[in-house]
Amino acid sequence: MKLYAFVVILAMQSFFGAGITRAALPGQKDYLSSIEADKIRNAESPDERIKLFLSFADDRLKKLQYELEHPSQTRHAEMLNSLLNAYVGCIDDAADVIQLGIEKQQNIRKGIDLMAEKTKEYLVILQKIPTDSPDAEMYKENLEDAKEGTQDASKEAEAAKRKVAPPPVRRKK
């Protein structure tokens, strides 16, 4: 009976302890390092946040290309899927910052233009990744998600260009 009570108490502690640990890091994204999360948190404007998220996405995409060209001996599939998921997370977060900036009527024109430009570049890179190789089954589903997420972000950026008013033009006297 004492053993049963001990197991129940231990299980409850681990269950509730996990919730406390998660609550301690409210804004931490699992695909960002602590330094990257600090940079996002310290960014003063939405344009800066968009730029940071896109640079992190670019970094993940470069690492993915390297990993495809130089496969590691261990955990290759896990690494590819992790990089693809991190890339999609960065793109989605940049799109979220754009939507929030539009709702708050902030000046995010540069961020929108950068998003439209970069997502087109990223889509070209993603489409060049082979899907017919024997290893492609390991990451094919996440690659399709990445392509779809990038296309959606590109469409949203183009739509946001039309929504956001152009900057005022000064008249010369």
Where are these regions (language model features)?
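Long, charged/polar, soluble alpha-helical segments
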Residues: R22-K173
